[in-house]
Swiss-Prot record:
Pfam family, one: Amidohydro_1
GO biological process: 'de novo' pyrimidine nucleobase biosynthetic process; 'de novo' UMP biosynthetic process
Source organism of this protein record: Acidovorax sp. (strain JS42)
E.C. number(s) listed in UniProt: 3.5.2.3
InterPro entries for the chain: Amidohydro-rel (IPR006680), DHOdimr (IPR004721), Dihydroorotase_CS (IPR002195), Metal_Hydrolase (IPR032466)
Positions that bind Zn(2+) 1: H17, H19, K102, D250
Organism lineage string: Bacteria, Pseudomonadati, Pseudomonadota, Betaproteobacteria, Burkholderiales
Protein name: Dihydroorotase
């Protein structure tokens, strides 16, 4: 890393949690990510979900076709864990270059209706993953209607994650997009096979952002933004230098008319300015010197992959993202649309 008061050069980062959708929208969102990141973990929650090595390989080719010419970018593919994903698919997936499977509790978030209804139904597949070295990526929320929305992550740790870890002590688990002090503390105290990703929006905002001046649907995501005490705990974890925490945007594009709706979709689109938003969060915390580890070093180490060899440079320079991007036949409104950002990617 090299830095001055107004510029910062770091090893090219990776995004360890990304949604790019499919079809025509790929042509908008993939270039945004490829401009900043060397690699990205691609979420499998399409309709239908990506549940086979063959589907993952085909999806990867569609993503690569949307990467601008001359840009080096590698999508890292995942499978969607279901109650009946066969264990023998894991070996095929590993041989095809798939790196992980994603656990969505059924009903927890966008396109999660095919998700897991009972973790015990997946145990044979998880055993195969532990043996093959595939990672388990976890959306860590319970979905019981009697559990308060803001408590679902903390309850998941006690009811699901602790027993899961006890059964599979050497399965590498990424607790994705953590949002609470309880999650940060759990990961900090867990063994070397547990890590977590943190989004830029959960570092920058608490739940007040959803309600400032009225309902602001573009700040609505799952897991939902939490109290300020939780945001502060996430900032402390991200800027601590611990290799258990690394960058995962959870950038989740939706057509604007489905966000700005009576029952709007969950998800914040941040890929257009992701590394700039992380720089802002780390700068706010007085920890720009910790950004490279979080963005470029800890993730590859946990996944057992080499670091990227290139660099990116950020400059302290105010700029304003556009109000929207084309998204197939719809419009995509990014987080911070029309609002000034203090850091800009320049190389």
């Amino acid at each position: 890393m090299t830095a001055t008061t107004d510029t910062l050069t770091i090893t090219r980062p990776d995004d360890w949690h990304l949604h790019v959708r499919d079809g025509e929208p790929l042509r908008t969102v993939v270039p945004h990510t490829a401009a900043q990141f060397g690699r990205a973990i691609i979420m499998p929650n399409l309709r239908p979900p990506v549940t086979t090595a063959q589907q993952a390989a085909e999806y990867k080719q569609r993503i690569l076709a949307a990467v601008p010419e001359g840009v080096a970018f590698e999508p890292l593919m995942t499978l969607y864990l279901t109650d009946n994903l066969p264990p023998d698919e894991i070996a095929r997936a590993r041989d095809a270059g798939v790196v992980a499977a994603k656990l969505y509790p059924a009903g927890a978030t966008t396109n999660s209706d095919a998700g897991v209804t009972d973790l015990r139904k997946t145990y044979k597949t998880l055993e195969a993953m532990q043996k093959a070295g595939l990672l388990l990526l976890v959306h860590g929320e319970v979905t019981s209607s009697d559990i308060d929305l803001f408590d679902r992550e903390a309850v998941f740790i006690e009811q699901q994650l602790i027993p899961l870890r006890r059964h599979f002590p050497e399965l590498k688990i990424v607790f994705e997009h953590i949002t609470t002090k309880e999650a940060a503390q759990y990961v900090k105290e867990a063994g070397r096979f547990t890590a977590a990703t943190i989004t830029a929006h959960h570092l920058l905002y608490n739940r007040n952002a959803i309600f400032t001046g009225g309902i602001r649907p573009h700040y609505y995501c799952l897991p939902v933004l939490k109290r300020e005490v939780h945001r502060q705990a996430l900032v402390q974890a991200a800027t601590s230098g611990s290799d258990k925490f690394f960058l995962g945007t959870d950038s989740a594009p939706h057509p604007a008319h489905l966000k700005e709706h009576a029952t709007g979709c969950a998800g914040c689109y941040t890929a257009h300015a992701a590394i700039e938003m992380y720089a802002e969060a780390f700068d706010n915390a007085g920890a720009l010197d910790k950004l490279e580890g979080f963005a470029s070093v800890h993730g590859p180490a946990f996944y057992g992959l080499p670091r990227n060899t290139g660099t990116v440079t950020l400059r302290r320079e105010s700029w304003t993202p556009p109000d929207s991007f084309a998204f197939g036949e719809a419009a995509l409104k990014p987080l911070r649309a029309g609002e000034a950002l203090p850091w800009r990617l320049v190389a």
